[in-house]
Curated annotation (Swiss-Prot):
The gene is pepQ. InterPro entries: Creatin/AminoP/Spt16_N (IPR029149), Creatinase/aminopeptidase-like (IPR036005), PepQ_N (IPR048819), Pept_M24 (IPR000994), Peptidase_M24B_aminopep-P_CS (IPR001131), X-Pro_dipept-like (IPR052433), X_Pro_dipept (IPR022846). One of its GO terms (cellular component) is cytosol. Its cofactor is Mn(2+). The lineage of its organism: Bacteria, Pseudomonadati, Pseudomonadota, Gammaproteobacteria, Pasteurellales. Its EC number is 3.4.13.9. This is Xaa-Pro dipeptidase. It comes from Glaesserella parasuis serovar 5 (strain SH0165) (Haemophilus parasuis). One of its GO terms (molecular function) is phosphoric triester hydrolase activity.
Length: 440
C-alpha cells in the first residue's frame, strides 16, 4: 500500500498544481471539517469528513485538521490533537504507511491554525465551514475552477484508491453472508442489520450509507431504512443493500434472495443477476454509460413480456416507457470516497455538465467510460404501487396482468449490484473478484 499511496500523492500533486495554475492561486487549504451540533443542543451528529481532505489524507476520522498543498512541496498536515478528558482524542498516525508523505505539525488548540495561514487572499479554501474561512481571511472559498479540476480527476481512481475499494468489497461480503444467514434463520430486519454490523465490525455511525435491510414488500421502497423489530409472519423475499468503507473508500453491494428457491420469483432474480453480469461483460472504454442503461431497459422489457406481467411485445413495452415503471432508478453511479461519487455528469476539467435525458431523470452518470473509473452496476425490478397506479387508467391498462402484478407485490422487488473498475480491456468486477477469494 505504501508504494501505491506514494504514486497516489504524486498524482494529486500534479492535479493540485494544474488547478492552482488555472485559478491563478498560490496554494490550497483544505479543512477536514467538524461535527455539527443539533439545534439548541450540546449533542452532535456523527462526524463526516470533507472528502477532499480524505482524498489526500487516508484517515476519515481526523476532525478539525488542516492540509496545505501547493502542488510542488510535500503536503503539510496540521493535525488537531487536543488535550481533553471529556472525549476520546485522536492518536496521530505518525507510523502509518502514509505518514512519510506529509510534513506534520500538531495543533492542540483549533485557534493555532491562524499562525500558519500566510497570505490567505492568494490561496483557495476547500471545506464546508465558509464562515470560518472568511474569519481567517480567505476570499477564494470553494472556487469553482479548482473544484471542477478536483472533481473531474477524482472520477478517475488511482491504483491506491482501487485497492481500497477492493478491500471494502471483502468486508462487505462478510456482512452480506451473515445477513443472508440471519434472514433464513427467521430474524427480524433489526436483527439482520445487527448481524451485518457485527460481521463487518461497523456501527450505524460509520457505515458509508444507511443499510437497506428489506424483507418482503419493503424491497419496493428504494431507500428503505426503517428496520422492523418484529419478524414477519411470512417470508417471501429479502433485499440487502449495504457496504463498508476502507480508509474512507466505500463499497456498495446489493443482493436479493427468494425464500422459496424454486419459485418464479427466484427465476426472476437469476435473470436479473445474468443481466447484470452481461452488462459488465459488455462494458468498454469510450462507450457512454447511458447506452448500457438503455440496454438494461430493453432487457427489463423482455422480462416483463417473458414473465407475462405485460402482454405486449418487448419492443412496444420499451417504446411505451413501461419498463421505467418497473426499473425507475439509474443503472448505477460513480463510487469512491462518496457513495454517489462526484463528476457523474461532468464532462471535462472546465465543469461542462451533461444532464440525464428527461425520460431517465434518476440516471447518475452521463459520462463516456474512461480507464480508472469505478462504478456500480445495479439493475432493479420492482412492484411499486405508486408508479403502477399511473397505468391503471391508461389506454394500455388492459395489457397489464394486474392479477399477477398484485400477487408479486408481496416480494417488493429485486436489485443486484456489483462494483466495477474500467480497465483498458473492459470492466473488472471487483465484487466478483472478492467473492472468489471469500468463497475459498
Amino acid at each position: 500500500m505504501q508504494q501505491l499511496f506514494s504514486q497516489h500523492i504524486a498524482r494529486i500533486q500534479q492535479i493540485v498544481q494544474h488547478a492552482l495554475e488555472l485559478a491563478r492561486l498560490d496554494g490550497l487549504w483544505i479543512y477536514a471539517g467538524q461535527a455539527k451540533y443539533h439545534f439548541l443542543d450540546d449533542q452532535t451528529s456523527p462526524f463526516k469528513i470533507n472528502p477532499h481532505f480524505n482524498y489526500i489524507f487516508p484517515d476519515p476520522t481526523v476532525e478539525q485538521s488542516w492540509l496545505f498543498l501547493d502542488g510542488k512541496n510535500k503536503p503539510k498536515l496540521y493535525f488537531y490533537a487536543p488535550q481533553d478528558y471529556w472525549h476520546c482524542t485522536p492518536n496521530p498516525p505518525t507510523s502509518a504507511f502514509f505518514a512519510d508523505e506529509f510534513e506534520w505539525q500538531m495543533l492542540t488548540d483549533s485557534q493555532q491554525i491562524q499562525q500558519y495561514i500566510i497570505n490567505p487572499t492568494h490561496c483557495a479554501f476547500i471545506g464546508e465551514q465558509t464562515e470560518l474561512a472568511k474569519s481567517l481571511g480567505f476570499e477564494h472559498i470553494n472556487p469553482q475552477k479548482v473544484l471542477n479540476v478536483l472533481h473531474f480527476e477524482r472520477s478517475i481512481k488511482s491504483e491506491f484508491e482501487i485497492e481500497c475499494i477492493y478491500q471494502a468489497q471483502l468486508t462487505a461480503l462478510a456482512g452480506h453472508h451473515a445477513a443472508k444467514e440471519a434472514f433464513f434463520a427467521s430474524k427480524s430486519e433489526f436483527e439482520i442489520n445487527l448481524a451485518y454490523l457485527q460481521a463487518t465490525k461497523q456501527s450505524d455511525n460509520n457505515v458509508p450509507y444507511g443499510n437497506i435491510v428489506a424483507i418482503n414488500q419493503h424491497s419496493a421502497i428504494l431507500h428503505y431504512t426503517k428496520l422492523d423489530f418484529t419478524p414477519p409472519c411470512e417470508r417471501h423475499s429479502f433485499l440487502l443493500d449495504a457496504g463498508t468503507s476502507y480508509l474512507g473508500y466505500a463499497s456498495d453491494l446489493t443482493r436479493t434472495y427468494a425464500f422459496e428457491p424454486q419459485s418464479e420469483f427466484a427465476a426472476m432474480i437469476a435473470q436479473m443477476e445474468q443481466f447484470k453480469l452481461d452488462t459488465i461483460a459488455d462494458m468498454q472504454v469510450g462507450m457512454n454509460y447511458l447506452s448500457y442503461h438503455t440496454q438494461m431497459h430493453r432487457w427489463i422489457s423482455q422480462m416483463l413480456h417473458q414473465f407475462e406481467f405485460v402482454k405486449l411485445p418487448a419492443d412496444q413495452i420499451f417504446e411505451e416507457g413501461i419498463s421505467r415503471t418497473f426499473f425507475p432508478h439509474g443503472l448505477g453511479h460513480q463510487l469512491g470516497l462518496q457513495v454517489h461519487d462526484v463528476a457523474g455528469f461532468q464532462q471535462n476539467h472546465r465543469g461542462t455538465r451533461k444532464a440525464p435525458p428527461e425520460i431517465y431523470p434518476s440516471l447518475r452518470c452521463t459520462r463516456d467510460l474512461a480507464e480508472g473509473m469505478v462504478l456500480t452496476i445495479e439493475p432493479g425490478f420492482y412492484f411499486i404501487e405508486m408508479l403502477l397506479n399511473q397505468w391503471k387508467n391508461h389506454p394500455l391498462a388492459p395489457f397489464f396482468n394486474w392479477q399477477k402484478i398484485d400477487e408479486f407485490k408481496r416480494y417488493g422487488g429485486i436489485r443486484t449490484e456489483d462494483n466495477i473498475v474500467m480497465r483498458a480491456t473492459g470492466a473488472e468486477n471487483l465484487t466478483a473478484k472478492a467473492e472468489s477469494i471469500s468463497s475459498r
